[in-house]
Structures are given as C-alpha cells and as structure tokens.
Amino acid sequence: MMRNKTFFIVVLAAMLLVTACADTAIDRHALVMRNNPHVTKIDSLHSLTVGNGRFAFTADATGLQTFPEYYKEGLSLGTYSEWGWHSFPNKEDYKIVETLQDHPLPGHPHGIYAVQFPEGPERNAKAAEWFRANPHRLHLGNIGFDSLLVSDITKIDQTLDMWKGELHSHFLWRKLPVTVTTSCNGDSDIVSASVSSSAKLAVGIRFPYPTGEAADDATCWTADDCHSTDIILSEPQRALIRRTVDSTVYYVEISWSGKAVLSQTGKNRLKLTPSDKQWNFNVGFYKHQPVVPQPDYKANLLSANRCWRDYWQTSGVIDFSSCTDPRASLLERRVVLSQYLLRSQEAQNYPPAETGLTYNTWYGKFHLEMVMWHSFHYALWNKADLLEKQLKWYKTAVPMARDIAARQGFNGIRWMKMTDPSSKEAPSDVGSFIIWQQPHVIYMSELIYRARPSQEFLREYADMVEQTAAFMASFVNYDSDNDRYIIQGACAANESYNEETTLNPAFEMAYWHFGLSIAQKWRERLGLQRHAEWDEILAKLAPLATSPDGIYLPAEKGRGIPDFVNGIPAEKLPEMPAGGYINGQRPKEADGSVSLSEGEKSKRKHDPFYVTGTSSENLLAYGMLPESRLIDQEKMQKTLVRAAQNWNWSGGSWSWNYPTLAMNATRLLQPEIALRAITMDNREDLLLPSGNNYRSTRLRSYLPGNGGLLLAVSMMCAGWDGCSVSNPGFPKDGKWNVRWEGLHPMP
C-alpha cells in the first residue's frame, strides 16, 4: 500500500513538473546564445555584421575589415548608414522631365511614366540611367588591420554574441595571438573595437570613392583625386576628419585609449599605430560635424549591450528546443539569425534596401514592393514601433506620390517602385508599371493599429490611407460586358507579365480587395460613411482566373501565361526535398541551373509554376492575405499542391517564394507542406553562417527572404483572425512542441 502511495506521489510530482515546464517562460538568453554564428576560417561568404538598424559594420574573420578585396565578391565588408548617400556631378544637366514618356495602356490611354528609353533617344536614355544611379548609398570607410596578408592568419575562432551585440574574434598572426571584440553603439553610428596582442598591429582607415555601379561593394580605390580626407582636429586621443566626396560632406571621429599615433599615409588613408598590447578605439560617422566628443569604448559597448538586451527581452520569440523532428533546430537557428540580421540592418527610418546595409544592389536604393517582405514582420513580432518608423517616411513621400498619380491621370497617390530617402522615382521600364506595392501602406497601417489601437494613430495616417485607396479605386476599369471591375495596364508582381497584355493578375486582384476593405474599415472607425463607389468595386471585382482543371492562374491574360489544359493531377501530397539547408557551404554552381529529362521538360513546359521568373502570386492571394469572396477554398487547395509539385525551385524561385508557399499552406491547414516549404534544401535559399540568404553571385545577401521567413513562422505559430488551431503551421505528430511568446496573429 505504501509502495503504491509512493508511486502515485512520484507520478503526480512528475506531472506537475511537466505542467510547470509547459507554462515556464522561454529562456530567451539560452535561445539566442545557442544559435550564435561561429566562424573558423577565412571565407568571403562568412563575414558577420554588428549594427543598430540604421548603421552597420560588416567584418571579416579578424573582427575588422582587413581584407576587403578578398571579400569583395562575397558578403563584402561594408560600412553603411541610412543617411550616407552620394550623387555624381550632373555635368550634362539632366532633368527629370527627360525621363518621362507618354505611354498609353489598356484601360488607361493617357499616362506619363518614368522609363529608361532602351531604344532612344540617346540623351533620354542617359538621363534615365543618371537618375537611376543617383543618389547611391555611400560606403563610409574601411577599418581594418594594416598591411596583413590572408596567408598570415591561422587558428580562427570567431563568435558573434547576438545577445550582447558583440563580435569576438581570436586568431594567430604569424603565430602571435590576436583577440578583438567589435561592437556598434546602439544609438549612434559608432563602431568600437578592443584589441589584445603583443603584435601591436596598426589599424588602417581607408576611404573609397563610390563606383556608381548597380551591384557591388561601392568602393573605387583608384580615384583619390576625386575626393578628400582632411584632419580638422587633432588631440592626443582624438581626431576629427572631414570627408568631401563631390557635393557630399560628412565627418569621421576617431578616438582611442592608451598611447597610439594617428598618421595620414595617403590622400584618403589613415593609420592608427598603438604602443600598448591592449588598447581600444572608436570610429564614429556623422552627417553633420559633431560638437561634443563621442562616447568612449566602454560607453559604446554598454550601449550595444543595452540595445540588444532590450530587443531580445521584448521581441517575439520562438523556442523549438522541445521539438524532436530533426528539422527543428535548423529552423530555430534560421529564425533567430533572421531576427538579428533584420534588427541590425533594417530598423531604419526608411524602407530597407534588398541587401540591407551589407553592400549595394540596385545602387543601394529601396524597392517599395519589398517592404512587405522586409518589414511587415515587425508588427507581428511585437515590434510595431520599428515598422512605424518606416511608415513615417511614407508621409514625407506623399507629395511625390501624388504627382505621379496626377501625371498618369489617376486620383489619390501612386507609390513609386524604386526610390531613395528623397522619394524621387527611379525610371524603369518595369518598375514604373508595377502596382503591388500600392496597398502596402494600408496593410502596414492596419498591422500597426492592430498592435496598439488608438484614435490618435487613425487620425495621423487616415489621409494617407484614404488617398492610397483613392488611387486604387481610380485604377480599376469597369467591364460592362461582364458587369465586373478589372485590373489592366499594369505589370504583374512576377514582372514576367507586362503592362501591355496583363489582365487581372491574381495577387493584385486579391490585394485590391483587401486594401479597399481595410480603407473602408478605417473610415468606419473614424465615424465616416463608407464610400459607395468602393463598395461597388468590392462587390464586383473580378474573381481570380482559373484553368480548366480548377487551378488558379497567375493572371487571367498575359503574354507568356501557359495553357493549363494538360495540368498535373493535384491529389497527392507533393514530394519536395526536406533536409538541412544550413550548411554554410559555397554553392557549387553560380547559375542555378538544373538538369531535367526531355520527358520532364515536355510534361512541365506548360505549367505556370515551372516558368522561371514567376513568383507564386496566386498563392500570395491567400496566405499573405486573408480569405475573401475572390477565393474558392477547393481551388486554392489544388493550386497549392500543384505549386508544391511543379514549382521550379532550383531555377526560378526567389527567397520569398518559400514563405509564400508556407503561409498559403498554413491557412489551408496543410502544415506538412508549410514546413517543407521553409526547410527544403535548395541552393537559391542557402543560409550562410550569418543568416543571410545566398541567392546568386549577384545577390549574396537577400533580406526579403529573412523577413518572409519571420512572417511565415509567426503565422505558423500565432495563426490569424478566427483561427482556432494551435500552432496551425506545424504537424500534429507529436514532434513539434513549438513554444512562443509575443507573437500576434495575421489578419
């Protein structure tokens, strides 16, 4: 009897312990620390970043930027800020008006667009290229050990402490140990480093001239006569530098501890030579001349620690440590690395560039259609304040957006595609005609409002939401033959179906319905009447087009849309690769090509999901967006499986196609498909040690993939409005005990 009683007590205690563990708060410190990146060799794709979201410093295996030439074609060693921009002198006096062209389109016979003039006239084409390339993001300066060789560096042991925002690097230089700790001030554009070594290595500070190229590390080292570096203040442990790069002027403050000598070794080169084995230094970058000395090393380090501790303690988090599926630890690692990457490079006052603050692509300018992937996740991970910082920039861009709509004959404001802090539209033969960025402002505003609802917030952004929707309402055309509203005269989101031939692109149709619905809801919250015209559009907006076998098409019409008559049956669960994708290995092929049999090519050549360049926009219509009258559940189920089976994952995908598929599958309660979508082993979504997505030799970093992952995984955990399933994106097979805190559901 006593034995049975004892056994009962033990079992009860165990049950209570399990219950207590289930309710115990996530150990956030342990979660972050077990996923810290670790580097043991010099590899141009293994660089790591410290940053505060508005300024970032990317370092090589030495903890500084010692080998920029070696890393040039990998994750290059950049020092970038949100304010650092440069324009080449406009010697030909190009005018914006020279980039504009009357471009009649179906449904919109009168419209003036900013284009590139590929067929001339030559001056217009050159004007368009000048405005595309200017302004471009400026590399502020390279900071690295002076005159070291890659071959001299051995025994590398480097760890990024993401909890503190500290990069710890240890290596041997000619058999002498060197230890470096690197950090970035949490509030200011200051990089700090402490160095411990009997080698007493000097630090070189070099300033490049910009290249103006669309995609590179923005460093030209052979144009010293085009810019200048002047020491305007020199004190025993501090110096102030004025940088003049054409019309761009900025300032650099260098401060250090102990005995060291700062010397100018070239027109745009400095060297800081220490006398002590242990010392530290700080390099701060300023848009305007600083009037007080910058913080010292200790203060900068504490600022970095505070910034990152506060972030990790208040952000949403997901803990996969209780899962037994072998994919769980890999997925957790990718999530945590993405959180760090985006907070360190994309917590800006402007929309981010596609490669963040790592290196320049598209001249360092930002693409407004990508804001959805870069930044929407903040509102779902308990960081709506970071999303609102970017929303505030949109308010400054309203006048430019209103001018665009007016010259094209539309009401309201039309958001540009590619731009910079000035909000000037970059001319483009594609970007000027896309529209899927248009409802983003409405969605952003709604996500922030849901996170912290208030009448004050509604009033602040109501006019921008209203005017954004006004353009949307004026852009649709009424098709009297079929008593419906249609979208035409726009380039589809995939940029494969052009503005001349595309009719009713799937994602844009669903997004128009969602955006106008939310805009009406905002009017009601403010005590205003609904727009009758908008309600009519909502009631008569054309449903998504389908193939004869009931698969949603990317668009109803468009040049290049395949014939679906011989579609592949969609009954079985798709066979997709599922395995480790975090291997840190350099891709073997640069072109992403795949080998298919002739039979496979023949079978798939007419399938829309196997057309390189398409972007799964029919899946975006239900995943990123909630259910609407435009969506039929049965057809979307078939579309999901068809996409999962036949998408050209090895040659036609972007890093955000995977979360697109995952979100669609999650809403359709297909968790295994959702999970496979974000864990498949595919080189175009290769995860580097830093957490960056390697997509191609041009896009060695692609941060929309990281933001998309966070969007998808948050939905897989927290679901959406009206979802009653716990962790709806994870299989209920006992292997996925996913715990999370601080996440918010999708609409």
Please identify what each model-predicted range represents.
Residues 9-19:
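Bacterial N-terminal signal peptides
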Residues 23-365, 384, 394-402, 583, ...:
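Acidic/polar, glycine-enriched structural segments that form the non-catalytic walls/loops
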Residues 65, 70, 88, 367-400, ...:
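Active-site core of glycosidic bond-cleaving carbohydrate-active enzymes
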Residues 173-181, 185-190, 447, 451-467, ...:
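A conserved hydrophobic secondary-structure block that centers on an alpha-helix together
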